[in-house]
Amino acid sequence: DHHLIFEGMNEPRMVGLTNEWWYLSGDKLCEESVATINQLNKLIVTAIRETGGNNKKRFILVTGHAASFDYTINSKFEIPADPENPNEKRLLVSVHMYAPYTFVMHPDMSINKFTPEFRNELYQNFKQLYLKFIKNGYHVVIG
């Protein structure tokens, strides 16, 4: 049933800290955050599946730190096990990708042409998502 898709968290992060939005490999707080979010994703999947009924088969979005593309690709983000669906991938990876940043988020509105460099950045990002998740049977939702 695709009428309802659960998302347990939206942009979970270390609010107010230096690496609130950016992942720094090896940074103690970043690594602790990733481990905590991995645990929370497991708890969310378990809680939803244990309610029974259609929730045993519904799609669930799981996310990395800050729902960040960078964190999700480069950290120790893990997709939790889904024992209710061992032969079907019912967990979807959720990432927010504000890229190319200069084109989509920069306050200078004069940057309004989609350049080959911007295209290449998106291509590389999509390629990384493909190699890490889609190639392994997981779907990705980009917000």
Give residue spans per PLM region.
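Mobile cap/lid helix-loop segments that gate and shape the active-site cleft of serine hydrolases
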Residues: I111-Y123
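Active-site region of glycoside hydrolase catalytic domains
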Residues: H2-M109, N125-G143
